[in-house]
């Protein structure tokens, strides 16, 4: 069991610590708790010099109603920013975001989606290549020619402002399709 101050603790079945490099290698059933967040994995390296936790054999970060899963990631305990790469899935309530790369800011609960990404929220499906999704407000700013499909309607634009259960707005080369009317 490793404890740093009153905000960080790390438990695992096996750990090696390199005092010279100030690096902890934690293996098997690793649980890193930092404030209200919990990071679960089987392989984690914690760099005490840079306050950086890296997982590389799959991991899950739980932050309130948000649950992030990916093959590889890092969590910076000082800035409380995280990066998730490869097979990323963010569940926020009933909403699901899938992408290849996601940056998550813990204090604001904002996800930055990089590369081909999909947001599924009830009957709505959003496809984008670049965007920011606020999991507290369920609002998104999307770039890179994004598309929102909701039942019989779709909107595509160079950028979109998406509000769950509200109005969405497109900007630049907008195409709106209403299959019902």
Q: What are the residue ranges of the model-derived segments?
A:
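Structural signature for solvent-exposed beta-strand/loop edge elements and short helix-capping sites
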Residues: 1-181
């Amino acid at each position: 069991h490793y404890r740093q101050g009153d905000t960080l603790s790390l438990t695992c079945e096996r750990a090696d610590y390199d005092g010279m490099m100030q690096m902890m290698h934690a293996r098997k059933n690793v649980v890193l708790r930092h404030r209200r967040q919990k990071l679960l994995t089987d392989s984690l390296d914690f760099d005490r010099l840079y306050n950086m936790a890296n997982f590389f054999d799959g991991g899950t970060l739980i932050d309130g109603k948000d649950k992030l899963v990916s093959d590889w990631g890092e969590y910076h305990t000082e800035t409380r920013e995280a990066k998730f790469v490869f097979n990323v899935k963010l569940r926020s309530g009933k909403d699901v975001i899938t992408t290849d790369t996601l940056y998550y800011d813990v204090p604001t609960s904002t996800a930055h989606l990089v590369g081909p990404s999909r947001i599924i929220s009830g009957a709505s499906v959003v496809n984008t290549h670049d965007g920011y999704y606020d999991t507290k407000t369920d609002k998104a700013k999307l770039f890179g020619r994004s598309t929102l499909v909701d039942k019989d309607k779709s909107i595509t634009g160079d950028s979109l402002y998406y509000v769950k259960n509200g109005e969405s707005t497109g900007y630049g080369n907008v195409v709106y399709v209403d299959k019902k009317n």
